[in-house]
Amino acid sequence: MTGRRIVADVGGTRSRFGISRGPGDLSEIRVYPTAGQSSFAEALATYVIDIGAGPAEGWCGGAYIAAAGPVDRGAVQLTNAAWSISAREVSQHLGGVSVALVNDLEAVGLLLPHLQAADLAPIGGVARAELIGSRIAVNVGTGFGAATAVRVGGTQWAIAAGEAGHMSLAPTTAEEAAVFGFGRTVEDLLSGLGIGRLYAAHARGEGVLISRVLEH
């Protein structure tokens, strides 16, 4: 059995694939528009062909897939795309290898305890504080996701991921209430599509004509 493993980061807009032979190793990276493939299985097959791998038996030693949606019983339906992914079906496609399927922010949460100073960029000129407590990862992309890493032992961490983008927002001013006509949840306004909605809301408030595409 080979030490090569497929790793994939599957989002609502793009899906990234690569090959890993060990911690910190990543090669054969390819990026595909999620909407450009009918399913994850098709995207995976395209990737295998693109890197010239398979169908030789044993070329792949396993797969790790991080997907933008809630994972339940080894399967996920992407929150912002039509794809569904089953770890069992992916395993069958790859010859019965082990397949790990996790939420994309859970994968980021697993990384948090291993980040070094060189991996970080302080925001606002504030010096980096010593990271001794819980940590949170937030991702603003096609949607909005978050995960928390909580220390449960000397070197052990528990990762809790959730669909934070579906939390409701509550306006506190008349201006915010006007904006909320364009979206009611965190993800409605703080995401790739949400930026357009925020712009549309403020433009309408200023009497500026804009494309209706930005309002949806």
Q: Could you tell me what each predicted segment is?
A:
Residues 2-46, 58, 159-166:
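Short glycine-rich, Thr/Ser-proximal phosphate-binding strand/loop in the N-terminal lobe
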Residues 53-101, 110-119, 137:
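Short beta-strand-loop/turn "lid" adjacent to the catalytic site in phosphate-handling enzymes
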Residues 131-188:
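Glycine-rich phosphate-binding loop of actin/hexokinase-like ATP-binding domains
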Residues 1-26, 137-152, 195-202:
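Gly/Thr-rich phosphate-binding beta-strand-loop-beta motif of the actin/hexokinase/Hsp70
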Residues 180-216:
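A mobile "lid/hinge" subdomain adjacent to the ATP/sugar-phosphate binding pocket shared
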